[in-house]
Every structure is written in C-alpha cells, then in structure tokens.
C-alpha cells in the first residue's frame, strides 16, 4: 500500500465537519442469473494524511482476493475537494484514488480509498475507455462485453488539477435487467483553459445469482449539501455504485461536486448500500438533486 501527495501548503485549523441525514428509495432491476452469488466480499480502506496538501493519491491493496471495485470518501473537504480518480485494477488487486482541491482551500482534509475485495468471480474483466485530450466537457459510455454484467465503475481525470468535476455517472440499465455499463460526464469548473482527458472504467463478470440495481434520490432544492443511500435488498451487497448530481439549470451543472461515493453498511451487517454525497462547489441559487445507484450482488 502506498500514499503520494503533491503541492504542500501550510496547514490552517480544520473546519467543522458537517453531519447529514441520508434516505433511500428508487427503482430496481433484476435478472435470472447463470452462476452462484458472489461470496467473500469485504472492504479494505486506507486513508491519506490529514493536512492541506492540494492533491492526494492513495493506493490500497486487497490482502486476499482482488479488487472488484471500490469508492472514496473525503473528510472535511467542505465542497472544495473533489474525487478526481477511482481506478480499480483487477490484475494487481488494487484501488487507486486521487482527490484534489478545487479552489485555494486552507483547511486540513483527507481522502480514504475503499477497495471492495473478493475472490475473482467467473469471467472477471476490467474495461477502460479514454477520451481525446482537449478542453471541452466530456460524456462517455462504457459497457461490459458480451453478456457480462456490471460489478463496479471507476474514472480518472488527466491534467484536470481540480478544475474538472465528474458529477454525473448513470448506470446503463433497464428495469428488469442488471446494469451492464455506465454513462459518465465530466465538466470544467471556472472556465479551465487547459486540455485534459477522461478515462472511464467498468469491472464486469459473468451474471451472478440475484444481481440487481437500486437507486435513491434526494429532493430537488437549493440546499448546498446533499447525501443519499441506495440500499440493496436483504442478503445482497453493494459491490459498486454511481453518483449523479443534476442541476435544473444546465448552466450551473459544472458547480456540483461529488464529495464521496462508497459502499457501506446500513443498520449493521453486510456492505448493503451505496452512499453518495455532493456539494455546490460554488454557491448557486438553482434547485438540484442527487441520485445514488447501488450495484447489488
């Protein structure tokens, strides 16, 4: 396991951490599977240092099995720190997470990489797509090959330096079927002039018993912070998920920042839910909402 950090600035006293309530609701899809349910799933977390360094990268390795996905949580980012990369590597059994400050943020903060580890299921593959390198906003779709179904998603913004926000990740799925891919959008914040790239990742496997997806959604209003859970049915784990923050005014979509997206245990027990947290990166007056998707396996 390793941690790297860049661009150190002097520390200033940490800001207070907000506590938020979360809700769960939404649609679901299921399929009749071809193989046994995924077993042996567990979370392996690793946190960065808690300081005011502008960029932090954490690499966590699964002690056993391999990384079939994972997520990231930011502590004390206050909407001024965004998750820039969540990269699962099924060959190395690692999850790499990078977070960067979006503005000159003076307070201490940390990011935690949360690898989802398990014995490799049948047909396990990771698919990666990448965009052209230019200064335009980007939307990309990435799908599982053949009849494989989705376990988790990831992304990596190259040369964005905190000025590019991945704030819309939507599952490719229909009611009655499992997810088979994602549509992902990344947008420039503050008129970022430099060229940058977006890489998207999906981790897929042969269909697994009971596999389905669920979603949770917040109310649509102008509050600056939102959080929501998507909770799997009893007996299933959230092997991955996605977060989608949507402004009702397209002109302010680039001001919404995903703070955290990760699997967790609701009411104890297994990792049965996927939580998404989002902030207004700069204040807006428009209403917006947040959707959390869980891939349940």
Protein language model regions, located:
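Residue-level detector of functional hotspots within protein domains
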Residues: 13, 22, 103
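Hydrophobic alpha-helical elements and their junctions with loops/disorder across both membrane
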Residues: 20-26, 77
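Extracellular attachment/recognition segments
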Residues: 37-297
């Amino acid at each position: 396991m390793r941690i790297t950090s860049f661009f150190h600035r002097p520390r200033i006293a940490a800001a207070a951490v907000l506590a938020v309530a979360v809700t769960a609701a939404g649609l679901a899809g299921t399929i009749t599977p071809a193989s046994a349910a995924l077993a042996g799933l567990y979370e392996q977390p690793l946190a960065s240092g808690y300081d005011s360094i502008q960029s932090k990268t954490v690499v966590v390795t699964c002690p056993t099995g391999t990384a079939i996905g994972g997520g990231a949580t930011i502590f004390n980012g206050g909407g001024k720190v965004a998750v820039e990369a969540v990269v699962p590597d099924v060959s190395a059994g690692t999850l790499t997470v990078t977070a960067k400050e979006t503005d000159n943020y003076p307070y201490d903060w940390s990011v935690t990489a949360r690898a989802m580890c398990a014995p490799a299921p049948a047909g396990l593959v990771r698919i990666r797509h990448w965009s052209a390198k230019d200064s335009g906003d980007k939307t990309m779709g990435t799908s599982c090959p053949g009849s494989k179904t989705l376990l988790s998603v990831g992304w990596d913004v190259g040369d964005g330096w905190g000025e590019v926000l991945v704030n819309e990740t939507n599952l490719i799925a229909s009611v009655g079927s499992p997810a088979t891919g994602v549509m992902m959008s990344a947008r420039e914040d503050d008129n970022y002039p430099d060229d940058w790239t977006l890489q998207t990742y999906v981790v897929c496997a042969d269909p697994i018993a009971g596999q389905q997806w669920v979603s949770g959604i917040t109310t649509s209003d102008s509050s600056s912070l939102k959080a929501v859970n998507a909770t799997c049915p009893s007996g299933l784990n959230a092997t991955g998920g996605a977060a989608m923050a949507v402004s009702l005014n397209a002109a302010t979509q680039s001001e919404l920042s995903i703070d955290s997206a990760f699997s967790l245990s609701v009411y104890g027990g297994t990792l049965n839910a996927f939580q998404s947290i989002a902030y207004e990166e700069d204040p807006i007056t428009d209403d917006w909402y947040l959707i959390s998707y869980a891939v349940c396996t």
